[in-house]
Amino acid sequence: MFFPSRDIVERVRKEYPAGTRVELVRMDDFHAPPIGTKGTVRGVDDTASIMVAWDNGSSLNVVYGEDKCRKITEE
């Protein structure tokens, strides 16, 4: 299992602070929200996974190095 360095974790935390709006681009999970689902970042854990409260009620994390989301600059 790959664990990102402390520097990577801190970089992701700065890039995706709590409250940031994101859109799902890719998630490798059977229960993943549909691509394009929007949500609000709740935080970043110690493995650099982005914890998201998805607008559809899901709470699956965006796993660092596996899944992908993008910041929403305006809605």
Functional labels for PLM-detected ranges:
Residues 2-75:
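Basic/aromatic-rich interaction segments and small domains that mediate binding to polyanionic partners
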